[in-house]
Amino acid sequence: MQTLIWKDLTEQEKKQALTRPAISAAGNIKDAVDAIRENVVANGDKALFELSEKFDRVKLNSLEVSEQQIEEAAQRLPEELKQAIQNAKKNIEAFHLAQVPVEADVETQSGVRCQVLTRPINRVGLYIPGGSAPLFSTVLMLAIPAKIAGCKKIVLCSPPPIADAILYAANLCGVETIYQVGGAQAVVAMAFGTETVAKVDKIFGPGNAFVTEAKRQVSQAVNGAAIDMQAGPSEVLVLADENADPDFVASDLLSQAEHGADSQVILVTPSERLALETELAVERQLTTLPRSEIAQKALAHSRIFIAENLQQCVEISNEYAPEHLVVQVQNARDLLSNIDNAGSIFLGAYSPESMGDYASGTNHVLPTYGYTRTSSSLGLADFSKRMTVQELSPQGFKDLAKTVEVMAAAERLDAHKQAVSIRLAKIK
């Protein structure tokens, strides 16, 4: 990790130092996804079977997972892991139930009633990556709010063979239909529908560059599907003072660095001693990690910033706008009112990012790449939509009519004005 003294940097150097590793949909990825999209749209299930054999090296008999497969997966899963998943589910449910909106109903003036109604998105699709580290925790983060929101149809896609923990978590959370389909083809199938895979209105979940590009494409297609967010490489910024435990700080940096070679981790501290001790702790802990090679690649483009004080630390963090922000300082909550840009915040020495990733209750699907300046972590609201209602009594209409007529005339929208004038003339 490169260590930089913040006050010694020029404005241009500061901007450069906070730049994330470049991401782009390379031409070959875009072309490959184009071909997959055209194939799945044209050939439906046939294309999905062929692509599973090509990419996943699995010859499927059925795209849909059977109830028997789900039951057998639950039987194979260790009881300890089942209990852990159930406990995490309880906390995630509690946090997302607290987000159920209170519907607004207000009389803006006498005889003029305005409301906000919330309705679930009817059909949602959840994408869960497979591979060597299947993200069954993401099933909880997506399926639980979908269920609480009241989505009428919840389907899930994951590459075959689907891990037992994913099947167990999906069934536990009430996912009705699970398809053993992965990659860009799964996103396309959910967006447009096939003979077997149900078309959905919105797609949620992370994935590799091909999945990300497929989500981008279907979200821009006229008859495609909306998406939760465009995901970039994962990232964490740790803000720590001289009282922080360097072993704790190092473990938080590494827990993010092990996600991928394109991940980025940042330490911001006013303490040069802590910075040095954290670097040493990182080196020690790296030797114990099975994914140390991946973590080392991420550390190569990561940074340590030495700030003048905690206020400057917060300013640097707000400028970077991290996906995850770990605050390991004395009286960490005192800084909360000054933090403007972060996806999820972890306050205090005993709130590592891992807790939010799995079981504290908050959602781990977060904006990356600086989008926390304008975007929020995934929540219940993402699985629903708002409708506004207005209802005017004859007297309420009459009292407001002049205001609307004047405004419509000023904008030269005569039909708007006339819609009021005609009614006004008929009120006795």
From Swiss-Prot:
Substrate binds at S234, Q256, H259, H324, D357, E411, H416. Pathway: Amino-acid biosynthesis; L-histidine biosynthesis; L-histidine from 5-phospho-alpha-D-ribose 1-diphosphate: step 9/9. Its EC number is 1.1.1.23. GO terms for molecular function: histidinol dehydrogenase activity; NAD binding; zinc ion binding. NAD(+) binds at Y127, Q185, N208. The active site is at E323, H324. Binds 1 zinc ion per subunit. It comes from the Bacteria. It catalyses: L-histidinol + 2 NAD(+) + H2O = L-histidine + 2 NADH + 3 H(+). GO terms for cellular component: cytosol. GO terms for biological process: L-histidine biosynthetic process. InterPro entries: Ald_DH/histidinol_DH, Histidinol_DH_CS, Histidinol_DH_monofunct, Hstdl_DH. Zn(2+) binds at Q256, H259, D357, H416. It is an enzyme of class 1 (oxidoreductase). Its cofactor is Zn(2+). It holds the Pfam family Histidinol_dh. The keyword Zinc applies. Keywords: Amino-acid biosynthesis, Histidine biosynthesis, Metal-binding, NAD, Oxidoreductase, Zinc. Belongs to the histidinol dehydrogenase family. Catalyzes the sequential NAD-dependent oxidations of L-histidinol to L-histidinaldehyde and then to L-histidine. This is Histidinol dehydrogenase.
